[in-house]
Amino acid sequence: MDQNNSIPPFQGLASPQGSLTPGINIFSPLMPYGTGLTPQPVQTTNSLSILEEQQRQQQQAQQSTSQQGNQGSGQTPQLFHPQTLTTAPLPGNTPLYPSPMTPMTPITPATPASESSGIVPQLQNIVSTVNLGCKLDLKTIALRARNAEYNPKRFAAVIMRIREPRTTALIFSSGKMVCTGAKSEEQSRLAARKYARVVQKLGFPAKFLDFKIQNMVGSCDVKFPIRLEGLVLTHQQFSSYEPELFPGLIYRMIKPRIVLLIFVSGKVVLTGAKVRAEIYEAFENIYPILKGFRKTT
């Protein structure tokens, strides 16, 4: 072959001075633009093998998950391993998160049938109401009746008292009357009839309608001192105790619906009953509780 027509092999890039520089096997950032040479990415067998290995691992993982799903299709999936969830604390260790306390449900204290206090509360006051069935002139009643007072600026009713039974009546212009102070149901009814007869003698067509006992108050003594602080702590849903405001503990019983005033001396006042039996039942319910908080000196 002719040497003039032969093309010498590429040895490098021409410098501005026309001399040859050593051959450059890879793309260099020093290569000037517009030379007509386009760099090509270098591919190695190692990079291809890594990609193939990753694809193969992904395929194996997908196959294994599909097989597990087919085998466990009839079972409930678990988000956590059953061994990682334990409810009992490890021996010797205190659980970090104590279980929340269950709110207390108000329960009426019950008394065992075999236990009896042997104490009978005494009735101290009975409040009853009656309708006289006619309109009344309170000024006329106050002027003509004995033991009657009327001050409309202070209270819009005539206050009348009798000695036997020793009671007090509140007489309103509408014809309604409230009788207080009796010690028994019979005394309350008798006193209300006497007040109605007084109004009749003054010239009013008074009747005796709808007599009803509205409230009964009883009291007793358990004969031992009581720790009121301990009682209010264990029966918070029933009781309230503010010694700076009132020296007694207020206990609101659910059944029967009675309010008890309990004092540290052992005295107990029961109020809110409609019949005498509710007073007795409420005291029998509270007595074993009071025995549990007996103050020992």
Swiss-Prot record:
Belongs to the TFIID complex together with the TBP-associated factors (TAFs). Binds DNA as monomer. The N-terminal domain is extensively phosphorylated. General transcription factor that functions at the core of the DNA-binding multiprotein factor TFIID. Binding of TFIID to the TATA box is the initial transcriptional step of the pre-initiation complex (PIC), playing a role in the activation of eukaryotic genes transcribed by RNA polymerase II. Members of the TBP family are differentially required to regulate transcription and development during early embryogenesis. Binds to the promoters of select genes. The keyword Ribosomal protein does not apply. It comes from Xenopus tropicalis. Sequence repeats lie at residues 123-199, 213-290. Residues 56-78, 104-114 have a biased composition (Low complexity). HAMAP family: TATA_bind_prot_arch. SUPFAM superfamilies: TATA-box binding protein-like. PANTHER family: TATA-BOX BINDING PROTEIN (PTHR10126). It comes from the Eukaryota. InterPro entries: TBP, TBP_CS, TBP_dom_sf, TBP_eukaryotic. Residues 52-116 are annotated as: Disordered. This is TATA-box-binding protein. GO terms for biological process: DNA-templated transcription initiation; embryo development ending in birth or egg hatching; transcription by RNA polymerase II; transcription by RNA polymerase III. Keywords: Developmental protein, DNA-binding, Nucleus, Phosphoprotein, Repeat, Transcription, Transcription regulation. One of its GO terms (cellular component) is nucleus. Its main location: nucleus. GO terms for molecular function: DNA binding; RNA polymerase III general transcription initiation factor activity. The keyword Transcription regulation applies.
